[in-house]
Amino acid sequence: SLLELGKMILQETGKMPSKSYGAYGCNCGVLGR
C-alpha cells in the first residue's frame, strides 16, 4: 500500500516520502524486494 511504501521510503532515505517518492516511485519494486 502507499502507506507501507511511504514508511519504507522514509526509513530508507530518512526524508519525507513526498519528496523522494518521485525518484523512488519507479524503483519501488526494487526497494520493495
Swiss-Prot record:
GO cellular component, one term: extracellular region
One Gene Ontology term from the biological process aspect of the record: phospholipid metabolic process
SUPFAM superfamilies cross-referenced by the UniProt entry: Phospholipase A2, PLA2
Alphabetical UniProt keywords: Antibiotic, Antimicrobial, Disulfide bond, Myotoxin, Secreted, Toxin
Tissue spec: Expressed by the venom gland.
Domain of life: Eukaryota
Known function: Snake phospholipase A2 homolog that lacks enzymatic activity. May display myotoxin activity. In isolated heart decreases cardiac frequency. Also decreases mean arterial pressure. Does not show antimicrobial activity. Does not change renal parameters (such as perfusion pressure, renal vascular resistance, urinary flow, glomerular filtration rate and sodium tubular transport).
Family that this chain belongs to: Belongs to the phospholipase A2 family. Group II subfamily. K49 sub-subfamily.
Protein name: Phospholipase A2 homolog BmarPLA2
Assembly description: Homodimer; non-covalently linked.
InterPro entries: PLipase_A2_dom_sf
Keyword Signal: no
GO molecular function (one): phospholipase A2 activity
Keyword Ribosomal protein included in the entry's annotation: no
